[in-house]
């Protein structure tokens, strides 16, 4: 999954920091921060890796009950059966989490058709989360998390959306939660030196997309051999009566590791229909 690929890159950086910490007499704290899509990646990374001591998530945290309206990569199969954003936040607890309710750009997918781009992409909308939804999910997160958990919500006047991300209050909370106590002059209005200024990321973005494409192409090239070794060789021809028993471990792996499993049908059939279209010659029903 594309979210997993991005998370793995963050965790690789955490590996590097942890390796550097092992060389030092006093380990430096490890924190992650992200805005908008980066907030999603920081959020999931912190839930997975306990070495991350403090996390700042800006412009992402909210209720996910309508995740199907968002871009398709966010609509992870079976996610909402167990995990809304509050549940993910509880996985970070008791480590520190700073949630910044900031404004995000509105994006509507798919992009317009143009030369080289077809109209085949799935629809989806990204927009600034509503304040009511953010407050409600924050309240759920606090109830689900361990007693004394440090989950700070940064908003404008305690109830409105911030116009910018990475505000002084959010960054200071992140530093304090990471046990880095900033001095009175920790912030500056000066621009970073030329060496620290990021160049437009278009070329870097293209390289990362190319990495993902090549990685998946490589998996496709070798998948036949992997399937033979890990699957078919473990299912040699046998008596038909033993086939179901032979397949059971692979069936469970498919359910648990690949596509998920629908719950068993334990309710009576309840078909329903509704009229969706009518002409002078026929009526169409949805069943």
Regions found by a protein language model. Give the residues of each.
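Active-site-proximal betaalpha loop/short-helix elements
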Residues: 38, 52-56
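Alpha/beta-hydrolase-fold serine-hydrolase catalytic core, especially in secreted/extracellular enzymes
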Residues: 1-28, 50-53, 61-287
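A short acidic (Asp/Glu
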Residues: 42-43, 110
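Structural beta-sheet core signal
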Residues: 32-34, 57, 99
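Active-site signature of alpha/beta-hydrolase-fold catalytic machinery across serine-
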Residues: 44-48
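Gly/Ala-rich beta-loop-alpha elbow adjacent to hydrolase catalytic centers
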Residues: 31-42
